[in-house]
């Protein structure tokens, strides 16, 4: 009966059903990812489930696109799933380089919370696809919003990787020798042996995590820069002004300045170890405020749908 209802709903409301499936698979994947620290076979299961999650979100977004007739990043519900897609894709790409249970253990909780927020916190009217206002009926919608959302995904992953570096070194001095340009301390192989997954985390692991964090943040910063530029061009085309300093634009600029300072300190000042890791970890809150926090103000051109109104 449950399966029968599921298939019926899948026909009439595929977006919601696929969204719920993603949530439940993430719910199953979370304890398995934590168990991967003790059983190496669990890491393979986690990776397979993450691939399935990414595929289901892709299907969900495609269904949403076919129903609405526009790329599905026009409201908060759609953007939350697109963000989750970006984080899962980033997780899978990193795991190709560094097969450690640390990666899914930091990514999956965020993915689960993001999907849970979309499924159970957002009001139903935000889950319904609606027609775009004339100003949003532009190819800039895909070029601007998708790039910004992918930058958020990369920046979140980078910040969480830095948090993991701080956590695994909380009771000992942190003297990272990894290179900010990715040359010195990047000792990662595609054939990293699976039997090393359950070994205690050594100093070299911190170097690798730190370098992965730096690279993720660098990618996110480049994408955010492109997103801000494309957004300014779009704003001038739609409203005749390059920048209006609404809350989202202001916090996007703050986020850009924050990560620019992080990269400057690492590249120009040679920061290594605990200080850049603390700075990058704090960046998670900056991105969270930029993406979700300003929605609680309910004002501006980028509110993504007022949550409670």
Swiss-Prot record:
Domain of life: Bacteria
GO function terms (MF aspect): heme binding
Membrane topology label: Multi-pass membrane protein
One GO CC annotation: plasma membrane-derived thylakoid membrane
Keyword field: Cytochrome c-type biogenesis, Membrane, Thylakoid, Transmembrane, Transmembrane helix
GO biological process, one term: cytochrome complex assembly
Segment forming the signal sequence: none
Entry's localization field: Cellular thylakoid membrane
Family the entry assigns: Belongs to the CcmF/CycK/Ccl1/NrfE/CcsA family.
Quaternary structure, from the entry: May interact with ccs1.
Protein's name according to its UniProt entry: Cytochrome c biogenesis protein CcsA
Organism (species): Prochlorococcus marinus (strain MIT 9215)
């Amino acid at each position: 009966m449950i399966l029968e209802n599921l298939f019926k709903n899948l026909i009439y409301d595929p977006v919601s059903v696929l969204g719920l499936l993603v949530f439940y698979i993430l719910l199953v994947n979370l304890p398995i990812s934590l168990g991967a620290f003790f059983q190496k076979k669990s890491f393979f299961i986690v990776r397979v489930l993450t691939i399935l999650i990414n595929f289901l979100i892709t299907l969900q977004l495609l269904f949403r696109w076919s129903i609405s007739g526009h790329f599905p990043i026009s409201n908060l519900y759609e953007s939350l799933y697109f963000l989750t897609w970006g984080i899962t894709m980033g997780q899978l790409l990193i795991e190709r380089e560094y097969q450690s249970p640390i990666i899914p253990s930091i990514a999956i909780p965020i993915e689960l919370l993001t999907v849970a927020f979309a499924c159970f916190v957002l009001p139903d009217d935000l889950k319904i696809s609606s027609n775009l206002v004339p100003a949003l009926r532009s190819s800039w919608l895909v070029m601007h919003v998708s790039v910004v959302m992918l930058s958020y995904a990369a920046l979140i992953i980078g910040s969480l990787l830095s948090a993991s570096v701080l956590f695994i070194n909380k009771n000992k001095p942190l003297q990272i020798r990894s290179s900010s340009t990715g040359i010195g301390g990047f000792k990662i192989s595609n054939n990293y042996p699976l039997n090393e997954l359950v070994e205690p985390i050594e100093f070299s692991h911190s170097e690798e995590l730190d370098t992965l964090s730096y690279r993720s943040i660098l990618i996110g910063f480049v994408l955010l820069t492109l997103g801000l530029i494309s957004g300014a061009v779009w704003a001038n085309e739609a409203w005749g002004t390059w920048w209006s300093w609404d809350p989202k634009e202001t916090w996007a600029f703050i986020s850009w300045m924050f990560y620019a300072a992080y990269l400057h300190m690492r590249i120009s000042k040679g920061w290594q170890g605990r200080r850049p890791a603390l700075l990058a970890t704090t960046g998670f809150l900056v991105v969270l405020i930029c993406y979700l926090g300003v929605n609680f103000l309910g004002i501006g051109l980028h509110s993504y749908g007022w949550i409670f109104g």
